[in-house]
């Protein structure tokens, strides 16, 4: 069975790709460039992950319209990337409005064309930044949209195997699957060394710290988040 895996280049999508591969799916990898600050680093990570897992069918999509729409510190240089606050429940400035719906729509289109029956995405609800499009209820609803908006014989279904996990559990899962964490990139701000201070860096560093492992990528600073 064929599956499309959305691979941003980050830790979560890396682990999801490894999970889908371990389940025996023939993988087709999709990466979306949407004008994010670290697009070059993320694209490099995507290509390295695909090479590591010998994924031959790849699609790199240009979604520059999300940059033109703006409204996020990831796509608008006039909005600063906030320093992490792991205690807040507020949606941070890094939220890209309705981004995952755009990504999933493209993944569904491609799945129909290539005959994929599953779409894997590394969404995390339990230990995420509070993004509304990372909730299980959102993906349940989107599966209904797929059912209503595709050909009658289509059997495409979104899978979110990390949705209920903590970030530290995702690290453990990655260790079990022997994933190349050193190929992944999570920083929202920097394309050199990871900043260590943005929300994504903080959650990643905390996860590794909770597991008692060193994150193999380079950081400008490595605060203690536990």
Curated annotation (Swiss-Prot):
Broad EC category: ligase
Catalysed reaction equations from the record: 7-carboxy-7-deazaguanine + NH4(+) + ATP = 7-cyano-7-deazaguanine + ADP + phosphate + H2O + H(+)
Residues annotated as binding Zn(2+): 187, 195, 198, 201
Family annotation (Pfam families): QueC
Binding-site list for ATP: 7-17
Cofactor(s) listed: Zn(2+)
Keyword list, A-Z: ATP-binding, Ligase, Metal-binding, Nucleotide-binding, Queuosine biosynthesis, Zinc
Its EC number(s): 6.3.4.20
InterPro entries attached to this UniProt entry: QueC, Rossmann-like_a/b/a_fold
Pathway in which this enzyme or protein is active: Purine metabolism; 7-cyano-7-deazaguanine biosynthesis
Cofactor note: Binds 1 zinc ion per subunit.
GO biological process: queuosine biosynthetic process
SUPFAM superfamilies reported for this sequence: Adenine nucleotide alpha hydrolases-like
Cited PANTHER family: 7-CYANO-7-DEAZAGUANINE SYNTHASE (PTHR42914:SF1)
Function description: Catalyzes the ATP-dependent conversion of 7-carboxy-7-deazaguanine (CDG) to 7-cyano-7-deazaguanine (preQ(0)).
Protein family (similarity comment): Belongs to the QueC family.
Descriptive protein name: 7-cyano-7-deazaguanine synthase
Lineage start: Bacteria, Pseudomonadati, Chlorobiota, Chlorobiia, Chlorobiales
Annotated gene: queC
């Amino acid at each position: 069975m064929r599956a499309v895996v959305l691979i941003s280049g980050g830790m979560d999508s890396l682990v999801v790709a490894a999970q889908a591969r371990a389940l025996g799916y023939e993988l087709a990898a999709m990466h979306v460039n949407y004008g994010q600050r670290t697009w070059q680093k993320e694209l490099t990570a995507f290509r390295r992950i695909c090479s590591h897992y010998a994924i031959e069918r790849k699609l790199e999509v240009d979604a520059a319209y999300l940059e033109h729409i703006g409204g996020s510190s990831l796509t608008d240089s006039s909005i600063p990337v906030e320093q992490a606050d792991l205690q807040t429940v507020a949606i941070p400035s890094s939220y890209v409005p309705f981004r995952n719906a755009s990504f999933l729509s493209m993944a569904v289109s491609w799945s129909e064309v290539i005959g994929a029956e599953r779409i894997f995405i590394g969404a995390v609800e339990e230990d995420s930044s509070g993004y509304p499009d990372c909730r299980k209820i959102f993906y349940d609803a989107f599966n209904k949209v797929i059912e209503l908006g595709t050909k009658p014989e289509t059997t495409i279904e979104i899978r979110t195997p990390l949705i209920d996990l903590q970030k530290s559990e995702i690290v453990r899962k990655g260790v079990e699957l022997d994933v190349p964490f050193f190929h992944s990139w999570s920083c929202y701000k920097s394309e050199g060394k990871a900043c260590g201070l943005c929300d994504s860096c903080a959650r990643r560093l905390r996860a590794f710290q909770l597991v008692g492992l060193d994150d193999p990528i380079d950081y400008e600073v490595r605060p203690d988040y536990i």
